[in-house]
Each structure stands twice: as structure tokens, then as C-alpha cells.
Amino acid sequence: MKSIGCDIIKVGRFKNFLENKKKLERFFTHKEIENFKLKGGSVIESLAGKFAAKESLIKALSPLLQHKIHYGLKDIEVIKSLKGNAKFYLHNEIEKFAIKMNLKIYLTISHEKEYAIAFVMVEN
């Protein structure tokens, strides 16, 4: 089965995240935050793109969920490699679900000035 998810976000929503550490830590892991610091370019665009990626994955997984699982946005980690491609690292119940269902997850993120968009495809 294949499923897709897509999310678009206004980049401006994330300006205050850089000034509010608690807000940043509510949605992003320490590893993600460190990854933002290493990245060149706009940190705000990167924040928005990774948030959109998390939302896209939730949308893609929702038709596959046969029962409710408990997860938070920090259980879905989005890390960009040195090559520039973003990848999901899942934790806790959502990771167990992905392993049990033998899911392959594909992600692409793009941002342009005011908007960030992410597209996810899931197959098993």
C-alpha cells in the first residue's frame, strides 16, 4: 500500500522560535536543533521545512493506522545529511509501528522565501 502526505507552511510563523528556546524544544529534538546550527542558509526556512515534513508524515501515516498510537512531533526527527537530503528518524511508538508495517518512507522538502513545503510518500 502507498500513502502520501503534503504540508505547506508560511516561513514567517517560525521567526519567534529562534527567540523562544522552550517553543523550539517543544517541537524539535536537540539533535535537530544542532543540525539547524550546522546548516548554511536560512535557519527559519529550515525550521519551517522540517516542521512541514513532520506534519506531512503524520498525514501520510494516518490512513495506515489501524489503531491509535501515541506520539509527539519530537518522536519524528528530521535530520539533513551533509549531502543535503533530509531523512526521518522515528522514535518510540511511531518507530515500532513503522518497523512492524515494514514501511519505506520518502521525503522531499523545499522552501522559497515565504513558504516551505514537504512531501512524503510511504509504502510497505
Curated annotation (Swiss-Prot):
Belongs to the P-Pant transferase superfamily. AcpS family. Its EC number is 2.7.8.7. Gene3D superfamilies: 4'-phosphopantetheinyl transferase domain (3.90.470.20). This is Holo-[acyl-carrier-protein] synthase. The keyword Ribonucleoprotein does not apply. It comes from Borrelia garinii subsp. bavariensis (strain ATCC BAA-2496 / DSM 23469 / PBi) (Borreliella bavariensis). One of its GO terms (cellular component) is cytoplasm. Keywords: Cytoplasm, Fatty acid biosynthesis, Fatty acid metabolism, Lipid biosynthesis, Lipid metabolism, Magnesium, Metal-binding, Transferase. GO terms for molecular function: holo-[acyl-carrier-protein] synthase activity; magnesium ion binding. InterPro entries: 4-PPantetheinyl_Trfase_dom, 4-PPantetheinyl_Trfase_dom_sf, ACPS, Ppantetheine-prot_Trfase_dom. Transfers the 4'-phosphopantetheine moiety from coenzyme A to a Ser of acyl-carrier-protein. Pfam families: ACPS.
